[in-house]
Amino acid sequence: MKRKLLSAALAAMPCIALAAGEANTLDAIVVVGQRSAERFDGEDVGSKRLTAQRAATSDTASLLRDVPGVSLYGAGAVSSLPAIHGMADDRVRVKLDGMDLISSCPNHMNPALSYIDPTNVGTIKVYAGITPVSVGGDSIGGTIVAETPAPEFAAPGQTGLFKGEAGVFYRSNNNARGGNIAATYATDAFNITYSGATSAADNYKAAGEFKTFTATGRGTNTLPLDEVGSSAYKTTNQTLGIAFKGANHLIEARLGLQDMPKQLYPNQRMDLLDNEQRSLNLRYLGQLAWGTLDARIYNENVKHFMEFGPDKKFAYTAGNTSQGMPMKTEGKTTGATIKANIDLSKQDVLRVGGELQQYRLNDWWPAVVGSAGMGPNDFLNINNGERDRTSLFGEWEQRLSKEWLTLLGLRFERVNTNAGMVHGYNLATFPTAGAGGMMNQTRDAVGFNNANRDKTDNNWDLTALARYAPSTSQDIEFGFARKVRSPNLYERYSWSTANMMSIMNNYVGDGNGYLGDVNLKPEKAHTLSATFDWHAANRDWEFKATPYYTRVTDYIDAVQWNGTTNVARSPLLTNQFVVLKYTNQSARLYGIDLSGRMPLARTGLGELGLKGLLNYTNGKNRDTGDDLYNIMPLNAKLTLTQKLGGWDNGVELVMVDAKSKVADARNEIKTPGYGLVNLRASYTWKQTRVDFGVENLFDKFYSLPLGGAYTGQGTTMGLALPWNVAVPGMGRSLYAGVNYKF
């Protein structure tokens, strides 16, 4: 049935192709030098699309669901990890207001997009094909650029500008609730803006029973068979911005604050019970005689704490009711960027720039009083971790003729990583000789401490793009890219082979444990991609097709590891959670993205339209023949839209094929196909907007293909949890939101 639905969606896509102020913003001073760049811009989600989704989600990454080629790894409720063409997390560069932010957590519970509420997103652009070197770097999957609203200034002669907005929302399934407020005061040269948002939710319920146990390990506390344990959250994000404008120059400062007292995880052994982030972002932007100059310095500090949440067994030590398995992480990022757009001629633009980033990480697990296995000393997971990047790039864009536009770019990145010596719970010193120790902690620490941990990678990126527009209704963009990514600190420097420790180093949500390798090489990806764009001259209808092929040398995959013998496991264990070690192998990915929209009719019921999206990705390990982990199966979405006066409504049909191609080495869980129907409506009247809808209208049960393994309740400190239980999707949920602008 699901394949028939998907086939129908695929057949419908070509039909789309065949259908015949008072305030000044930053954009007013930055125009020259950008005209050609827009031709190679990423997919712009757009303010209308962003606004339409805000009432339905508190997860900023989910705003990208309708972008061709994008899927989402399931994680916490507000921390999904975007994947582009099958590559996610650190393989995708995510920039937030120009800052490169790094997850400071062994489970990557605090990704960059978790620090911005959907209501505070001004623009999001996704570079899912060939990424220009001016926005790429240290990534192989693509780039996501998210920005808060640009500062606005009063018109010349106006005494002052005061504006803002406030909103609230509610969602029924998990009792999600929250609100946001933003306010701006500006003159023609000064701007101060505050924005704040808070949201919280309880555990959500699936559309049916998906597990065979109710126990949580917390005494008599149990969860219903349809309740997804460890899916609740609470978070608050605030931003304060100050900007000064003079002639063609802008100076801007932004302070960001996050207080997240909890975000529970249904696919991790631990839960986030505190995350505090502070960021300071300073920027200069100017339009000069020769082009534009953009310079920025920023700093971020993160304090992160994990423990067993209320749905997971807490007490593993007799007599100690105050500690389960505490884990602390502190990360500090300092960065600087400078970019210049130089107008060489009316046809040529040269972009040059440089970037610096310094990242420091400490990840330690405090001793548990009275525990033989988790004491008497702190466990040093990553001690004084360092990851420093220095990069330079140059990019030449040339308009050869009215029909042809080309782009050629080269980027150099030098990445230095290092980490200090470590010890386990059993020692207070840093061993360089010895063996054994409970759970092989001494042996593993000795091997790590004696290894050469200071690594330097010299990485080269290359992008060549061309765009051909033979008519006003057709564009073809095609190109080649070489992209390189160096391993992150957890891939290189997590060191324990023990089950209990390794399962805490996992940011893919598959329930397994992971062990690093100090000798990992950078991943090197070579991509061919093209986009065929047919459209009306006024874009009333359009149809896009993007085929792509990527081959990755030294792809960081994983092999099953025997902690006792400290070698790769053979034969492989099946149908259970295991320990794996990161290793360099070879991979290839290919696929196609289809998207389009068309008007249907103008009737007394309003303007009717149809839009659609279809994605397909295939990923394979070329060394082992295994399928790559967490590849989204064939999926499609068709939406019937209606607009009448202030009404803007839609009926969505979401279709996902079965996930049958899975990574055998990781014992990845297969998921069946499904189809969902969502209803969405909004009404705008003057300064007020009301959004409401129903997600999963028919309360259909389904498992999330990229949601990972369910580890949301019970005794999670080991490998013995029930295997083959996928995290299910949410059952029927009604939502409503109101926003008022003043």
Question: Where are these predicted regions, by residue range?
Answer:
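Transmembrane beta-barrel wall of Gram-negative outer-membrane proteins
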Residues: S172-A201, T212-P261, L272, E276-W290, ...
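N-terminal periplasmic "start-of-domain" segments of outer-membrane beta-barrel proteins
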Residues: L26-A61, L81, D89
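Short acidic/polar hinge/loop motifs at secondary-structure boundaries
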Residues: L101-G129
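C-terminal beta-signal and adjacent terminal beta-strands/loops
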Residues: A207, V484-R485, A558, D657-K661, ...
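Gram-negative outer-membrane beta-barrel transporters
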Residues: R399-T406, R414, D540-I556, W561-D664, ...
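Outer-membrane beta-barrel signature, preferentially recognizing the C-terminal barrel domain
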Residues: M270-A289, K328-T333, N381-R389, Q441-R443, ...
